Regions:
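A residue-level detector for the "anchor" residue at the start of short, highly conserved motifs
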Residues: 5-12, 21-240
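Disordered, charged N-terminal biogenesis/targeting segments of membrane/secreted proteins
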Residues: 1-2
Length: 240
């Protein structure tokens, strides 16, 4: 019982933090400002053993790895694999900010309203709108994710972290940006991405390249991308 109360308290705390993010969003969105402040001011930590999904008006504990899918109207469908049940919810207020927190030992994936799919690794969280704006597709990431971005020439997709931004039109890539790690990395599977560091220096990657990012320092090298994305398929690669 005490464990249940602790988890629920965590959900409430995270919901309050998200409310502050949403308040900032609604106040500044029309001014064209970025979402960096939302990520920097987000101090919620990931703990417990359940995936937590936070919307504008509720926090839900998902007991198993979850797969979410948003349609173009902002409605979401949640698939809890082990229970094989579906929970549907319709958003009455559009452009809500949602947050998913994935603890150690769990994973989740989301299909956004534009068709982009994101796989979220353990110990990670993502803040995102239920519907992307016509000319703006942005999400905030802490931890490790793999994205398969739906191509839209008129609307780049931007992934923001604490130390760098990634701008793409349509591609597949992996981002590893845990808060406790000294360095972060981006691995490009196919397509093209542009990484911008805190000091505004830019690095453009080609397929099968990785960029290590430590502060404002970057280093690009060629890699076997399968070693960096196998986690999303629950695979562990062993070398002889």
């Amino acid at each position: 019982h005490r464990r249940h109360i602790y988890r629920w308290s965590l959900s409430i705390a995270a919901a309050i933090a998200l409310a502050l993010v949403m308040n900032w969003w609604s106040t500044n969105a029309d001014e064209g400002t970025e979402l960096d402040i939302a990520l920097l001011n987000d101090t919620t930590s990931i703990c417990g053993d359940e995936v937590i999904l936070i919307t504008d008006n509720q926090a839900m504990n998902l007991k198993n790895d979850a797969s979410l899918k948003y349609d173009t109207l902002g409605s979401s469908n949640i698939q809890q694999y082990a229970l094989n049940t579906k929970i549907s919810q319709a958003s009455s207020v559009k452009n809500e900010m949602h947050q998913i927190m994935v603890p150690n030992g769990k994973r989740a994936d989301i299909t956004f309203s534009d068709g982009t799919r994101i796989y979220i690794n353990s110990g990670s969280k993502v803040i995102y709108p239920d519907i992307f704006e016509e000319r703006k597709r942005e999400i905030l990431v802490e931890g490790e994710v793999y994205l398969d971005v739906a191509k839209r020439k008129d609307c780049p997709f931007v992934v923001k972290t604490r130390e760098f931004d990634i701008r793409v039109l349509g591609t597949s890539f992996n981002v590893c940006a845990y808060r406790e790690d000294e360095a972060a990395s981006v691995v490009l599977v196919h397509g093209s991405v542009e990484v911008t560091t805190e000091n505004k220096s830019k690095v453009r990657l080609a397929p099968n390249q990785l960029v290590d990012i430590k502060g404002n320092k970057t280093q690009v090298r060629k890699v076997d991308v399968s070693e960096y994305i196998s986690w999303k398929d629950n695979l562990l690669l062993l070398h002889q």
